[in-house]
């Protein structure tokens, strides 16, 4: 196991354990050949695994993850960064990971150690490459922070590595080739390349391919299981259900919610749900269903979007696939607006007007003959120097201090931000460094009292209205988590004034080229100078 633990004694506090651990992980980012759906191809892996190594920690711990870039395959990108999706990065904005926002890419044969105090954060997260479309080539994995005092702990008996469920869409073609298709003048409909299969915990099947054994989740009758379901796809959403079993939703994107029984739920790219499943049926095998929804599915003959299954296997049942029809989910589907945050419910500022109101709309425009996605008619282009470096080294504190296509909106510290995402096609919007309250969802009734709270929301139809507090200094990316969409320009960043960067600016290093003063972070000199 490529991990270790160091215990650090802390002063006991109401919400902090007496001992916190430093959780040490070693990530070798390397090219390996794998065949998760029966088709062998080279990928970008974490320690040679699909999905990547599971990271686990407890509330109050610190993650220390040493990333070594061993990539050599010229058919794929050979630099990398890693984003720790869902982690707030309070006081550690420089460890967030998106290339050219908080760091330069880690070049070949270099190492970088991400060090992230978790503070009081808990829940189901994941990690993935955040350089171009690299995570499509396989660099992604689960991350779980356990809470010894979880408010839902009495509701389940089992919550461990065996109950983490990773959903992925899978491509047989390397991401740089897919990017060329996206950036083609022939892509007049702005369609994402269609995947070849869907995976559950690293196993799937494509049309005409071999019958790869299904992933199996083992249960014992009478026990209650917390499944942590993660959508780590590039484009696809999945409709998750388990034959003959109800699902009780207790968490969305790391945030505990009031228990809500459903029969199925749709999960969009980047989202996570925890559900409780009671093993209360006859000891047998049952289908875990996750049919995939993807635009243009019929254009790829390899893809059967309905053929995304795993098996719920009861102790004592034969080791075999279920004999029932695979079918599709029936019953009550999750409606997002029926979710209610369990702890400190209520949108920041209540129903009063927000201190700052943002109107955001994903649109389209043609740039150099290529149709691109935009946020508010601006197509994002990554700067040559990371946004965080500009803030720290050049004291950038106004919108005008950044290039127009960097699309940066400076927010006042500790103010309530209202963001209205206008209607359009389905886009799962992700905000780094925060969660938001969804005060109005897809044409529903406004709810400022106990709305859902999460970090990825589906925007479509009639749009959504969000609330969050700008209380976490950093340059935080906002983007659609459909890979094609954000690669084609639909993202922006929301920094705070540099005076608020307390911990980041406490670490100094020499002046970087192109800046007027020391960048004040250990990240830039060793990484950017090699880029």
Curated annotation (Swiss-Prot):
InterPro entries on file: Cu-oxidase-like_N, Cu-oxidase_2nd, Cu-oxidase_C, Cu-oxidase_fam, Cupredoxin
Catalytic activities: 4 hydroquinone + O2 = 4 benzosemiquinone + 2 H2O
Record's keyword annotation contains Repeat: yes
Localization terms from the record: Secreted
Binding site for Cu cation 2: 85, 128, 481
UniProt keyword DNA damage, yes or no: no
Tissue: In mycelia, at a higher level than LCC1, LCC2 and LCC3.
Residues that, per the record, bind Cu cation 3: 130, 432, 479
Binding site for Cu cation 1: 83, 430
Binding site for Cu cation 4: 427, 480
Transmembrane feature ranges: none
Residue stretches making up the Plastocyanin-like domain: 23-146, 158-315, 384-507
Classification via CDD domains: CuRO_2_Tv-LCC_like, CuRO_3_Tv-LCC_like
Cofactor(s), by name: Cu cation
Main location: secreted
pH dependence: Optimum pH is 7.
Glycosylation sites noted in the Swiss-Prot or TrEMBL record: 66, 109, 186, 231, 280, 395
Cysteine-cysteine disulfides: 104-528
Keywords: Copper, Disulfide bond, Glycoprotein, Lignin degradation, Metal-binding, Oxidoreductase, Repeat, Secreted, Signal
Superkingdom, natural source: Eukaryota
Function: Lignin degradation and detoxification of lignin-derived products.
Oligomer status and interactors: Homodimer.
Protein name: Laccase-4
Gene: LCC4
């Amino acid at each position: 196991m490529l991990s270790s633990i160091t215990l650090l004694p802390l002063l006991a506090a109401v919400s902090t354990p007496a001992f916190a651990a430093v959780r040490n992980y070693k990530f070798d980012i390397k090219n390996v050949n794998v065949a998760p759906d029966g088709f062998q191809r080279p990928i970008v892996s974490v320690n040679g695994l699909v999905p990547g190594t599971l990271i686990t920690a407890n509330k109050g711990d610190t993650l220390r993850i040493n990333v070594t870039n061993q990539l050599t395959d010229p058919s794929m990108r050979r630099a990398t960064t890693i984003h720790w999706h869902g982690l707030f990065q309070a006081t550690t904005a420089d460890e967030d990971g998106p290339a050219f926002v908080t760091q330069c890419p880690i070049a070949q044969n270099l190492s970088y150690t991400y060090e992230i105090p978790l503070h009081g954060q808990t829940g189901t997260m994941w990690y993935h490459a955040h350089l171009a479309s690299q995570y499509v080539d396989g660099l992604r994995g689960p991350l779980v922070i356990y809470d010894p005092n979880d408010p839902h702990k009495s509701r389940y008996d089992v919550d461990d590595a065996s109950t983490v469920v990773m959903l992925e869409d899978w491509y047989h073609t390397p991401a740089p080739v897919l990017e060329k298709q996206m950036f083609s003048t022939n892509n007049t409909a702005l369609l994402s390349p269609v995947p070849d299969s869907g995976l559950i915990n690293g196993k799937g099947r494509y049309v005409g391919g071999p019958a790869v054994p299904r992933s199996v989740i083992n249960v014992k009758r009478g026990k209650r299981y917390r499944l942590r379901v993660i959508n780590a796809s590039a484009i696809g959403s999945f409709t998750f259900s388990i034959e003959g079993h109800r699902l009780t939703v207790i968490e969305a994107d790391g945030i505990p919610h009031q228990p809500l029984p459903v029969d199925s739920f749709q999960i969009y790219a980047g989202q996570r749900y925890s559900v409780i499943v009671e093993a209360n049926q006859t000891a047998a095998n049952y289908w875990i269903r996750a049919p995939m929804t993807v635009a243009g599915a019929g254009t790829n003959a390899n893809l059967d979007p309905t053929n995304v299954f795993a098996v719920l296997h009861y102790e004592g049942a034969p080791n075999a696939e279920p004999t029932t029809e695979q079918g599709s989910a029936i019953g009550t589907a999750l409606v997002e607006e029926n979710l209610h945050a369990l702890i400190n419910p209520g949108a920041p500022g209540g129903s009063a007007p927000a201190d700052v109101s943002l109107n955001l709309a994903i649109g389209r425009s043609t740039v150099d003959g290529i149709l691109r996605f935009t946020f508010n008619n601006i197509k994002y282009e990554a700067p040559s120097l990371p946004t965080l470096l500009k803030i720290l080294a050049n004291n950038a504190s106004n919108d005008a201090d950044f290039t127009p296509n960097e699309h940066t909106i400076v927010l006042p510290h500790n103010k309530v931000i209202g963001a209205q995402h206008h209607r359009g096609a389905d886009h799962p919007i992700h905000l780094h460094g925060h969660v938001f309250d969804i005060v109005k969802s897809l044409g529903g009734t406004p709810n400022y009292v106990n709305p859902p709270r999460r970090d990825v929301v589906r925007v479509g139809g009639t749009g959504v209205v969000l609330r969050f507090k700008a209380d976490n200094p950093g340059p935080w990316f906002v983007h659609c988590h459909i890979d094609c969409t954000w690669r084609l320009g639909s993202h922006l960043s929301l920094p705070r004034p540099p005076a608020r960067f307390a911990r980041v600016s406490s670490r100094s290093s020499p002046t970087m080229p192109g800046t007027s003063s020391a960048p004040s972070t250990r990240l830039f000199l060793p990484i950017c100078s090699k880029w």
